[in-house]
Amino acid sequence: MGNYADNAYYWMKRNGHAPKYEHAGIYCIKVDDKIVYVGKSRNMLRRIAAHYAHIQMGTETKYRILSEARRKGHSLGFDVLYYAKSKRYADINTELGEKEGEYIRMYSPILNT
């Protein structure tokens, strides 16, 4: 999986996604503009690239669901919900943990189970 995720990461960087996603923060996966998953990462670009790889491989139930949705013509997308404000590693983890919970409660995404 590592090579596929690395390839997706470098493709995303080459195509101009780094300024938006290469940060610590809270991101979401959308199907037809509906938030279906909320996650946190110290580097959202790397995490989103890993999600792309997993969707291609269908390695877990949530990724098989997303792959099937795409196969049926639904649009899949990613977006940033929140950028971390803290700079220290421990503070970022605490901040993102709290914010992730807030966004999960706010959106009740079906794939956060």
What are these regions (language model features)?
Residues M1-R46, A90-D91:
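GIY-YIG nuclease catalytic motif and its immediate N-terminal context
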Residues P19, R42-A90:
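Conserved short loop/helix modules at catalytic or binding sites
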Residues I29-D32, E68, Y107:
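Compositionally biased, intrinsically disordered low-complexity segments
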